[in-house]
């Protein structure tokens, strides 16, 4: 690997070992003689493969040192003193010692623990650290003896102060690495680990250390850190765990054939197939498959946000979110996207983001084949098929598939509107609604159609618009074979056939097929007219009414007839006009068979059969079939004459009377 300019290249692990071999072996070899050390700067220059090689070499050297006097059935003697802890290794039973290895000298540098053994993470917890890391300083140790000597400077307690025999020597070295290669478990003391590893296979503890050393290189287990790294601080956990771990074996799920290194991980996984949820919330009776999920869920009820940012006074439920947020303030390591230069605090977030550019969607739904960029998105999507709605509102009982939907829904009950527009002061319950609203002020339309260049403020509007170009209408009605571009429009249409009107007005009892129609109808009772014309101040109950009205001021007539060139301000007016050319009369009276080009004409006609006169004068009580007739009649009471002759100034209450009067001036004869 080429060295960066101005920095020295680290020595190769193999070359360092070769140099060690030249030393005088007659003086006796210690582990320190074959140990290889790197500084922090040198360690950072090594790539991943070189770091793995380093660990291989260190383990190989250790195997050579211990094999000189250690094998199955041999006796070992330990000599311990207050000044140092050492081991004498005999070549055979009864022979004199050939070498002395000082455990206090044998240690692995900090970068190794951090990079090669990522699960340890150099955590600083209690003085009795289950991964043999000093709790007060950041120095790392490979053996328990090193840790005890180091802790004497900071802590008077020595939880397992005893003579260190050869098995402890072997187990202590193995602890950091080997427990990640087998089942992934960690235990508070070396003896616990040795007992744990021996029990599943039926062998006695301390019976064979050479087999454990060989496990480093067997079946490439070195590269398998373990799938379930459980940290146990009590011996009873070891006893429980002994019955579920297999040395070198895998536990396979009979449903999906996924394999696990530990049986309790398999048991936990199988709850996905069985649907079993052992941990139940005492507040809402919702159950979970994992205890950690229950603990996180309970925070929803308490409203607790234990992780608070001191700079911005923002609080978080999860520690990971808090750490992620803090990186924005501290300006920590940022991972940059090569395509758009966007930066991220975590490399995993960058990898997920890059799928936007590559189009990769590695997570596919087994039910419908839909794929996603993130596993969490797939997990949420699968609830559509299962019908699971785990997040329930304690006020009204309504349930949701996603927790943020529940949080947003709760604001309906509390009336909370935490997101306020800085331009107009309008507030919103959701941040996404505020962002969309702010585009009205900024004029931003970030979603542009590639076909025609038309842009939109909302992504949903762009998707709806695209169907105009593609002509894609995948949702077809089974009754009339009419097709639609969106599923919810089909559902609304099907209510025409079923007669279903699920949205009912609480004031007058009138029901509607669409919720939007009910909202618009309610404005009749409340008198709300939220859409106001900036030109004349006239207001409307519907946005479409305002758009159509504005065309009176602008003179815009965007809808043109292809037959005669006549243009209209409304699409409905064009459709009605085109029936003049086609002769189409789709609205037929069931009583007499007469047909009409407009539905309003049919409704008015049917009142002739039924005798219905729904429009009544408030002054005299006279009823009328048509609303226009009522308006004309009311002018008798008000004296209003809106139609004035431009020639003589005479005015009339009806337009037809004005037309007839004009013929007096023009001398036109009908």
Curated annotation (Swiss-Prot):
InterPro entries (alphabetical): KRAB, KRAB_dom_sf, Zinc_finger, Znf_C2H2_sf, Znf_C2H2_type
Coiled coil (residue ranges): none
GO annotation, biological process: regulation of transcription by RNA polymerase II
Cross-link Glycyl lysine isopeptide (Lys-Gly) (interchain with G-Cter in SUMO2), where in sequence: 319
Domain of life: Eukaryota
UniProt xrefs under PROSITE patterns: KRAB, ZINC_FINGER_C2H2_1, ZINC_FINGER_C2H2_2
One Pfam family in the UniProt entry: zf-C2H2
Record keywords, A-Z: DNA-binding, Isopeptide bond, Metal-binding, Nucleus, Phosphoprotein, Repeat, Transcription, Transcription regulation, Ubl conjugation, Zinc, Zinc-finger
Keyword Amino-acid biosynthesis part of the UniProt annotation: no
Residues found modified as Phosphoserine: 126
Domain KRAB: 29-100
Record-linked CDD domains: KRAB_A-box (cd07765)
UniProt-recorded Gene Ontology molecular function terms: DNA-binding transcription factor activity, RNA polymerase II-specific; RNA polymerase II cis-regulatory region sequence-specific DNA binding; zinc ion binding
SMART domains: KRAB, ZnF_C2H2
PANTHER family in the record: PR DOMAIN ZINC FINGER PROTEIN, ZINC FINGER PROTEIN 22
Function: May be involved in transcriptional regulation.
Record family assignment: Belongs to the krueppel C2H2-type zinc-finger protein family.
Protein name: Zinc finger protein 551
Gene symbol of the encoding locus: ZNF551
